[in-house]
Amino acid sequence: MKKSIILLAFVLGAFTANAQSVVEGTKFTDNWSVEVNAGAITPLTHSAFFKSMRPGFGVGFSKQLTPIFGLGFQGMGYINTTPSKTAFDASDVSLLGKVNLMNLFASYQGEPRLFEVEAVAGMGWLHYYVNGDGDQNSWSTRFGLNFNFNLGETKAWTLGIKPAIVYDMQGSFPETKSRFNANNAAFELTAGLTYHFKTSTGNHYFTKVKVYNQAEIDGLNSSINALRSEVNNKDGELNTANRQINGLQKDL
């Protein structure tokens, strides 16, 4: 009977394992989004913080690989950040990695939370525009946070507040090699509106579902019922044996 009970426990464990939750909406065409950003940028050092702020605008698109990790491509343009008379004084085109800290530490619940925090890091091509010849190229790194508010019942729209530090890695080239230098960095603060396209599941986000195989469930139910019958039969045999023992003891 002990063997039967142990086997029953294994069957129940197998049933539980076959009812695990999985995430749907993981096709390549799923979980893409497009965004527009607007805000301001100011030198990190040696300037009046608010007085030196200049406008910045940009667009981007992202692909969420998992509920935790995503990749993004972003282009930003900045106005009046240098003495240049061009419409845009600088542009920064970046490849970004994103980590959803809420899903990382508190797990994904099946749909986006109302408020979430993303950590963002990346690098890109930084270009300075001047009148006539003499445009300059550099490369940038970016570190920031996105404070996201997921709007509506369908969570199709996200409003984000995005502070970031942007480094011009070659700001003092050729005197020094590429490096992180606060004197060649800027603080950027933007607000962004993101639209999340529908996935193959019809939602605008990863869908968490439980996967069942009905044939396996029916087979497991049959096994469980057979084991229950076997346990009941063993209990009956044990009760009969106990009665016989009691009768023999009385005869003695």
Model segments located where?
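Short loop/turn motifs that connect adjacent beta-strands in outer-membrane beta-barrel proteins
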Residues: 20-31, 68, 103-117, 151-157, ...
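Predominantly the C-terminal beta-signal and adjacent terminal strand-loop region
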Residues: 84-85, 152-248
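Bacterial Sec-dependent N-terminal signal peptides
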Residues: 1-22
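Gram-negative (and chloroplast) outer-membrane scaffold detector with strong preference
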Residues: 67-141, 153
